[in-house]
């Protein structure tokens, strides 16, 4: 019997494998979703460093949100990561959803980043 933990790990490996095949030399927009917050960062895998990051724990954003764990918070993080990416000169990324299903907060963050000007 396959456990749910194994299923999640398989899904994450499958997504990362597809990203490696498709991405070329593009940067990666990676997200992490906890029960109370959501985090996003743009990573350069060739250099092994994070260029830009945003989360619901950022000072200005935290004050303006009533909760860090809803779609509105994810949308705000998506807008913020896109704005910071533009300042850093990043326009094209590959969306790395990890093991998370493209639904709810993950989808809201992705759509906000697209609206903010990121292409993926």
Curated annotation (Swiss-Prot):
InterPro entries: Ribosomal_uL18_bac-type, Ribosomal_uL18_bac/euk. Keywords: Ribonucleoprotein, Ribosomal protein, RNA-binding, rRNA-binding. It holds the Pfam family Ribosomal_L18p. It comes from the Bacteria. GO terms for biological process: translation. CDD domains: Ribosomal_L18_L5e (cd00432). SUPFAM superfamilies: Translational machinery components. Coiled coil: none annotated. GO terms for cellular component: cytosolic large ribosomal subunit. The keyword Ribosomal protein applies. GO terms for molecular function: 5S rRNA binding; structural constituent of ribosome. The keyword Ribonucleoprotein applies. NCBIfam families: L18_bact (TIGR00060). Part of the 50S ribosomal subunit; part of the 5S rRNA/L5/L18/L25 subcomplex. Contacts the 5S and 23S rRNAs. This is one of the proteins that bind and probably mediate the attachment of the 5S RNA into the large ribosomal subunit, where it forms part of the central protuberance. Belongs to the universal ribosomal protein uL18 family. This is Large ribosomal subunit protein uL18. The gene is rplR.
């Amino acid at each position: 019997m396959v456990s749910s933990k194994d299923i999640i790990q398989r899904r994450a490996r499958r997504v990362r494998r597809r990203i490696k095949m498709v991405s070329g030399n593009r940067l990666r927009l990676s997200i992490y979703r906890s029960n109370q917050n959501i985090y996003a960062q743009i990573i350069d895998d060739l250099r092994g460093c994070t260029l830009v990051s945003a989360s619901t724990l950022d000072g200005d954003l935290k004050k303006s949100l009533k909760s860090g764990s809803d779609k509105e918070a994810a949308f705000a993080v998506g807008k913020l990561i896109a704005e910071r990416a533009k300042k850093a000169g990043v326009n094209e990324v590959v969306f790395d959803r990890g093991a998370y299903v493209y639904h709810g907060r993950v989808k809201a963050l992705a759509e906000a980043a697209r609206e903010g000007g990121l292409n993926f």
